[in-house]
A protein has these predicted regions:
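Conserved ABC transporter NBD signature motif
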Residues: 62-74
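Conserved ABC ATPase "signature" region
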Residues: 73-74, 126-145, 254-255
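Conserved ABC ATPase signature
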Residues: 149-154, 158
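A short, proline-enriched helix->beta-strand linker immediately N-terminal to the Walker B motif
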Residues: 169-173
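P-loop NTP-binding/switch modules centered on Walker-like glycine-rich loops
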Residues: 174-180, 184-267
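Charged, flexible cofactor/metal-binding loops and thiol motifs
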Residues: 237-332
Length: 333
């Protein structure tokens, strides 16, 4: 049985007399020890999905689902106090911006030890010892000294390592990483990615990694879920998705990035025409049809998820070996 099971997850946000359907019926599972990458452009609902899983949505947002369970625990039926017991304990999160994720008024040691004393019956001394061990595990030297420092005294890369250590304090089953390297420079990004991947393998963590960077996904993902306009339009093992993308949006994304060994110097990259549709009000049919070169009238109807062997695509044209629907500009069709 999957460690995390999500079925028909929706997030709706009232806007006066209208409603923004930000997340529209997500289905996915995460196995123990698996790295699932959720990829999509800004505004597709990735971050709201992570907040919905943590039950940390804005007050006006409404979360519904047919099923939302963690290791057999029904998270939909949990009270706020019960969810507080799960957060940081069984389910932890690494946020995008480390500076705003840490309280500037408290030392690193205070913030790390609080996680353990909140969820475990341990003394502050033991909690600080555990905090020092976790700082060392995430590659921070002079851990005892760092515990006495405050967030503003650390670099961005060190602050993000502290956030990772905080997420690991109670040895959670699932970690959600919401674009954890976006605010860091390229060199530090690579170090943090390697750290997350190494810890995931060492500790057997299930990780949901949220990003817009397909190059990053290719390096770290076990499975990939592609989001567009609040829906997962394709999900597959990472190698399968990159070698045999079936949804036109996925193909458009892959055509827009240079691929080592395939993209020639000076070769123009592809682009996806049109704009993302508004998600205000009732939505029907394929959300990508206004940008898809092969859209037909039937695409205006609700498109079911078409499941192949370990490969789901929400498209009427999904078929192994189908011709690409997007071509790089300047390339022959």
């Amino acid at each position: 049985m999957a460690l995390l099971h999500v079925e028909n997850l929706r997030v709706d946000i009232p806007l006066g007399q209208d409603t923004l359907h930000a997340v529209r019926g997500l289905d996915f599972q995460v196995e123990r020890g698996e790295m699932l990458c959720i990829v999509g452009e800004s505004g597709c609902g990735k971050s709201l999905t992570s907040l919905a899983l943590m039950d940390l949505l804005p007050r006006k947002a409404r979360r519904t689902a047919t099923r939302l369970s963690l290791d057999g625990i029904d998270m939909l039926g949990q009270s706020e106090r019960q969810m507080c017991d799960l957060r940081g304990n069984r389910l932890a999160m690494i946020f995008q911006e480390p500076m705003t994720s840490l309280n500037p008024a408290y030392s690193i040691g205070d913030q790390l030890s609080e996680v353990l004393t909140r969820h475990r019956k341990v003394s502050r001394k033991d909690a600080l010892l555990r905090a020092a061990q976790m700082l060392e595990k995430v590659g921070i030297s002079n851990a005892t000294e760092r515990l006495r420092q405050y967030p503003h005294q650390l670099s961005g890369g060190l602050r993000q390592r502290v956030i990772i250590a905080m997420a690991l304090m109670c040895e959670p089953d699932v970690i959600i990483a919401d674009e954890p390297t976006t605010a860091l420079d390229v060199t530090i990004q690579a170090q943090i990615l390697r750290l997350i991947r190494d810890l995931q393998k060492e500790l057997g963590l299930a990780v949901i990694f949220i990003t817009h960077d397909l190059g990053l996904v290719a390096r770290i993902a076990d499975r990939v879920a592609v989001m567009y306009a609040g829906q997962i339009v394709e999900t597959a093992p990472a190698v399968e998705l990159f070698e045999n993308p079936q949804h036109p949006y996925t193909r458009g994304l892959l055509a827009s990035i240079p691929i080592p060994g395939r993209t020639q110097p000076g070769q123009p990259l592809g682009s996806i025409p049109g704009l993302v549709p508004s998600l205000v009000g009732e939505q029907h049919g394929c959300a990508f049809r206004n940008r898809c070169p092969q859209a037909i009238p039937a695409c205006a109807d609700d498109v079911p998820a078409i499941n192949g062997h370990d490969h789901m695509t929400r498209c009427l044209f999904a078929a192994p070996g189908a011709e690409p629907m997007f071509h790089r500009e300047g390339a022959r069709s």
